[in-house]
Design a protein with these regions (language model features):
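Hydrophobic pocket/interface hotspot
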Residues: 6, 18, 26, 75, ...
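A mature extracytoplasmic/lumenal domain signature
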Residues: 22-24, 32, 77-81, 93, ...
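Short beta-strand edge/turn micro-motifs at domain boundaries
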Residues: 90-117
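Short, well-ordered alpha-helical segments enriched in acidic and aromatic residues
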Residues: 13-29
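Surface-exposed, charged secondary-structure patches
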Residues: 32, 40-86
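A short gly/proline-enriched turn/hairpin at secondary-structure junctions
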Residues: 27-37
Length: 120
């Protein structure tokens, strides 16, 4: 799936695979602990991930809810993030995907990040 492709790109530090997962006008945001919403460009995100040591970034996701209507999909994935095998943080990713040219692409991601109330 497109979502798995994104996380495979992160794990292998492959910026091209990461970028391929996104629609050309995609939006990437995170909600901080203080409820501030931060934006990041897909290019900046892919560049920062490409600088990581391969296999050092491991975001373990669970597909807990997937809704599809025509060319729109909403995907909810709780996750735990590990850096070089050590637990870093957890949270939830909320994806909006669009089907374009018969291919699903990520249009929007917003996530939460926390160190407490994690299952690890």
């Amino acid at each position: 799936s497109t979502v798995n492709q994104l996380f495979n790109g992160m794990k292998t530090s492959d910026s091209a695979l990461i970028k391929k997962s996104f629609h050309k006008n995609a939006v990437l945001q995170t909600i901080t602990r203080t409820a501030e919403v931060k934006n990041e460009s897909i290019n900046d995100f892919a560049l920062s991930i490409s600088k990581a040591e391969k296999e050092s970034l491991d975001e373990r996701i669970i597909f807990s809810n997937i809704l599809i209507d025509g060319n729109l999909a909403s995907v909810w994935t709780p996750y735990e993030f590990y850096y070089k095998g050590q637990f870093s943080h957890c949270g939830v990713n909320s994806f909006q995907l669009v089907k374009s040219n018969n291919e699903w692409k990520i249009q929007y991601i917003i996530d939460t990040r926390r160190k407490d109330n994690c299952k690890n």
